Every structure is written in C-alpha cells, then in structure tokens.
Amino acid sequence: MKKLSGWQKVGLFAGVGCFSIIAIAVVGFAIAVAYARSTLANLGDTTPKRVERSIALPGTTAEAPDPTVKPGTAKSGAETTSGGPMKLALELQEGTFVIKPGAAGSRVEVEGEFSEALYTLTEQTDTVGGSTRTTVRFRSKAPAWARMLAGVGNGDDNRPRLTVSIPTGVPIDLSLNVSMGESRIDLGGLTLSELGLDLAMGNHEVDFKEPVAGGMERFRLNARMGNVSVENLGNARAKSIDTSGSMGNVTADLGGEWRQGSEAELSFTQSMGEVRLSVPTKVRLEADVRDSNGKHESRGADADQTTDPKAPLLRVRVSTSMGESRVTRY
C-alpha cells in the first residue's frame, strides 16, 4: 500500500476533524432539544387547552345597551362611577393575539388556547393618581431557550392563541403592549379618550373598522422590529397621532370618517424602515416629508383634493432615516 504524502495526511486529518465536529454538533443539538423538552415537561402538561376568563372593570356600572344607538356615536352599556375614563392595560407576549370590541358592558372577555403549565394569564387592579387601572398580562413561565429548542419540528401547533374582547360603551384610556408575537387589532366602536400601542418583534395589523365613540385626544404608536399596518385611521378621530418606529415598516391608510371641520396633527418618525401613507382626496392635506437622504418635500393640495373648506384638515409630518417614505392620494 502506497504511503500517504504529508499533504495527504493533513487533508485526511482535516476531513476527519471536520466530520467529527459536525457529528458532535448534531448530537449536541439533539441532546439540547431533548433536555429542553424535558424541562418543559417538568412544568406540567404542555398540551394547549381551551381557556376562558371574564374580567370585571372596577368602577363601572353596567346598564342595558340601547339598541337604537349606533356604534361609535354615543356611550351605551356601562359608565364609570368616577366620572373619568377607566385605565386598561393589556400586556401580551409570545403568541397570536386578536383584540376586538366586545359586547356593551363592564367586562373584558379573554378566550383562547394555551398550556397553563407554560403560560400565565393574570389580572391586577391598582389605584394610580386617584384613577383605577386594570392590567391584564399574558406571558410565558418557561425559559426562552427551552421554548425555542423544544419547538423545533413542532410548527405552530402549540403556539398560544388568545382573543381579548374590550367592552363597548365604557370610557377607556387604553394601553396595549404586544411583543414577540403577531396581532390583529380592531378598536373600532370603542369609547377611547387616549390610546397607546407598543408593538414589537412581530407583524401587527391595526384597524378601526368603525368610528370610535366620543373624541380621542391622543393616539400614540410605537413599533419596533416588525411590520405594522394601520387601516381606517380616520375612524380613530384623534386630534393628535404620534407614530415612531425602528427596524421595520409602517403602512397607514388615513381613510375613515374624520369629523367634518376637524384638524389633526399626525407625526410619523421611522429609523431603519419605510413609511407608506395613503391619504384620501376627500380630506385636506398639508404634508412635510423628510427622508434619510435629507430630501425635503412639502405637499399641499393637489388637483384631485376636495375644495370643501369644511373638509377635515390633516397636517402630516414624516421623517425617516435609513429608509424611504411615500405619501400617495386616492
């Protein structure tokens, strides 16, 4: 048998070494997955089960809803005993979430499927500055590394799914935080005075399918590490809209039923992502757009814009860095 040359020996040893490293990595990964699944199993039954929860909003008095009142036009179903809006905070992590308007009344309804061994759903009521605040939290009990490794090969079958129904007819200051998941949010028809949305690490769809009741003073949206779309923003009827984001794209349709004769200030600030706005011609627009290249564009009325002096006036400011911005009319 011919002896191997020096370079051949080096090549042989290198090949054996690479194969050994790959084999060790595969075996190590398999052991890590098995250990992660064992860790989760020690917490209890990891099979998702149906869960339903009804959470009362303190400080409200329930009334029978008035069937003659159209959603988004007047308050019905419940009112606060303190005379001011209720403060409701939803903090949702790691799942697929649907937030929508519920029946008139004084209760937040939560339903969905998840393993109570792996996730926890809690509620808490505090008094802050003389106002009552109810906080609903959904989060994981298990370590992040264990959930990630144990989910290898399982698809989305065990992913938590939760639907939260917010009662109509109750004046609410709403704070909604969704992270490490996906959400479909419809807040149309609710009675909102202030709204704060913090959406991170996932794709999120926000809609106002019906006008909110009363008049919202301020709508704040913060988006990070994900894509966010907003539909029918005019139905929010907010006097001030402040949107900021990073590492993702924001798409907003400014259609909807803005109040006749109203004026609104809208600000969109984005870094490492795009901002795309669609504005109907039935509203008056004053746009100040600045992109990452320092290009500045001021837009006023165009040929198709309404000439009605009582049409809603939107003052829009857009600023992007490391991304593009676009404002289109329809």
Model-derived segments and spans:
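Glycine- and small hydrophobic-enriched segments that form the cores of compact globular domains
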Residues: 125-138, 158, 168, 197
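Right-handed parallel beta-helix
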Residues: 175-214
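Short acidic/polar N-terminal linker immediately downstream of export determinants
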Residues: 2-120, 142-171, 186, 204-205, ...
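Short, surface-exposed interaction patches in beta-rich subdomains
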Residues: 67, 103, 109-114, 119-122, ...
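Edge/loop elements at the starts and ends of beta-strands within beta-rich repeat scaffolds
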Residues: 80-84, 129, 167-172, 190-192, ...
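Generic beta-strand structural signal
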Residues: 92, 127-129, 270, 320
